[in-house]
Amino acid sequence: MKILVMILTASVVVRIEAVAQPIHPIPFASTGNTIELTIANTSSIPLSAVKVEAKNAPAWIRFVSSEHLLQQVEAKGEAQALFNFSVDKSSPVNQKHTLVFSISSPSGDHWTKEISISILPPTTFHLDQNYPNPFNPTTTISYELPAASHIVLKIYNVLGQEVATLVNTDRPAGYHQEIWSAVNQASGFYIYELLSTDASGNRFVARKAILLVK
């Protein structure tokens, strides 16, 4: 899903005024997002080799290219730098994050612009298949929460007997991972069950099979 996050105008000869910036919502675990930066040359001479660069982005934001070189910005003209990016599901949600862009020219002029974003929570509850599967002796169970919830994650054998409680606690909205160590368990199939209850009392239950091979 392609999203235009914002259009930013930065003057290369006029001081950038400090103004309040909106917080731009970005869909959870999304791809094809775009930040478009418009560089305006308000001088009477062309500017060449203007570098625009995303600086110190968090690891969960992946830019296709974090740097663009504008060969020339005409006098009284504009040029655009497009930054395409994806958001990893490990990103924290419902929090403000600041992306910093650096604009520099060969003459030594330098400007920065900050853009505020917030990653939206998942739209639905989801329980992933464990990985690896089959496994020995540990495996990872991942799930997504659209809202802060109380989580109970249990493991059962094929007879329906509980063999482990991995989680019984509150978790915020977003993506989470839990580890099951089955060192003391016998080979065979097991069932893991996720029970989630949010503040409004909405409940979600999901179960998946898991295979331990020793």
Regions inferred by a protein language model and the residue ranges of each:
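C-terminal tail/sorting-segment detector
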Residues: 116-121, 183, 187-214
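Terminal connector regions
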Residues: 87-119
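Intrinsically disordered, low-complexity Pro/Gly/Ser/Thr-rich segments with frequent PxxP/GP/PP motifs
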Residues: 63-90
